[in-house]
Amino acid sequence: MSAPKKVVLAYSGGLDTSIILKWLQTEYGCEVVTFTADLGQGEELEPARKKAEMMGAAGIYVEDLREEFVRDFVFPMFRANALYEGLYLLGTSIARPLISKRLVEIAEETGADAVSHGATGKGNDQVRFELCAYSLNPEIEVIAPWRKWELGSRTKLIEFAEKHQIPIAKDKRGEAPFSVDANLLHTSSEGKMLEDPAEEAPDHILQRITRPEDAPDTPEMVEITFEKGDAVAINGEPMSPATILTELNRLGGKHGIGILDLVENRFVGMKSRGIYETPGGTVLLEAHRGIEQITLDGASGHLKDSIMPRYAELIYNGFWFSPEREMLQALIDKSQEHVTGTVRLKLYKGAARCVARWSDHSLYSEAHVTFEEDMGAYDQSDAQGFIQLNALRLKLLSARNRKFNGS
């Protein structure tokens, strides 16, 4: 394959992608167009633009994608109550499809030969970026420098940056920072002492969540209103998707909610450890589960729960644009037609707890479930036949076992 003449680079302005920008220019002698997505990572993006200009980028795209990110990616995922391996809210995974989508679109708009990313050859992101890109354009070339160059460690990367006078960010203690990924849904931290799972993560790693021990001593109540499975208002005030998640991040972070220390199984086969901060997402998940409790019938809810692990795994592994994810999404979205109503939660020292929920679409019938007189709403004698029919199989099995086992 001939060397590319123009490459669109997913560019954060950080150490890795700044080195990649320089490397692409020198390795291929090509033009590099940078694309920086504002997904709510909380950073000022103008420095990334200026850095790209300083390093000779042929074109620079900086786009605010926060609303699209939450509306078209985060919210559909939360309709499923998706958790990878029962714990991880998929904050990094769900951002990759949107970034890949815009990379491919910009490549097509600018006539670029290839796209490039800063994911390492050991991680999941390389798979996610590339599977998404190929799903959208089967002819696109993807350049993954970490799988090509000799800079095989963060130490060598820093040495390269110093040699080429590329600025290196430092943390508040004057050290190179953890490997961090951030967006409106979460912040993840990896590397350094976190690579030893037997060592407790230091408190200074937290960037958006107060330590639960330092959170307010007074609980705070918050009400979240849903329409067809998506949050639409907080405390009665309608808000856009990104605004809702921003406000829930503020509330959850204030009360120490959403810290996860996780050792997970990467798609590429190894285990890795990360510290995940997902304040708003943790609150939103508890609220969504709360409204489903009264609006979703039992069989539908159990079916939905049974497919959730597979759905979460597809997102984690980079198959957002696959037909199987879309088929599962159609089932999930169908289940949300009546998931409309309001949930009240109590936020307190690391926990978000649903304490009340109500809806015009509720299936909860106090007349049927009451311990008091139900005025004929439920005939308890109906349970006799129900039990006998369900017991028939068990009785037949038991009779056979007694016949052949003598007991």
UniProtKB/Swiss-Prot annotation:
Its main location: cytoplasm. GO terms for biological process: argininosuccinate metabolic process; L-arginine biosynthetic process; urea cycle. Its EC number is 6.3.4.5. Pathway: Amino-acid biosynthesis; L-arginine biosynthesis; L-arginine from L-ornithine and carbamoyl phosphate: step 2/3. It comes from the Bacteria. It catalyses: L-citrulline + L-aspartate + ATP = 2-(N(omega)-L-arginino)succinate + AMP + diphosphate + H(+). One of its GO terms (molecular function) is argininosuccinate synthase activity. Gene3D superfamilies: Argininosuccinate synthetase, chain A, domain 2, HUPs, Single helix bin. Keywords: Amino-acid biosynthesis, Arginine biosynthesis, ATP-binding, Cytoplasm, Ligase, Nucleotide-binding. Homotetramer. Belongs to the argininosuccinate synthase family. Type 1 subfamily. PANTHER family: ARGININOSUCCINATE SYNTHASE. This is Argininosuccinate synthase. It comes from Jannaschia sp. (strain CCS1). The lineage of its organism: Bacteria, Pseudomonadati, Pseudomonadota, Alphaproteobacteria, Rhodobacterales.
